[in-house]
Amino acid sequence: AVXHPGTXVSXAAXXXFIPL
C-alpha cells in the first residue's frame, strides 16, 4: 500500500488497502 502509485485511489475504491 505504501509506495505504490494509486494507493489513495485504491483505498477509496475498495475501501481498504489494495496496492495496485
Swiss-Prot record:
Catalytic activity, per the record? 2 Mn(2+) + H2O2 + 2 H(+) = 2 Mn(3+) + 2 H2O
Q: GO CC terms on record?
A: extracellular region
Q: Does the keyword Plastid apply?
A: no
Q: Where in the cell is it found?
A: Secreted
UniProt EC number: 1.11.1.13
The protein's job, in short, is: Catalyzes the oxidation of Mn(2+) to Mn(3+). The latter, acting as a diffusible redox mediator, is capable of oxidizing a variety of lignin compounds.
Q: Which family does it belong to?
A: Belongs to the peroxidase family. Ligninase subfamily.
| Name of the featured protein | Manganese peroxidase H5
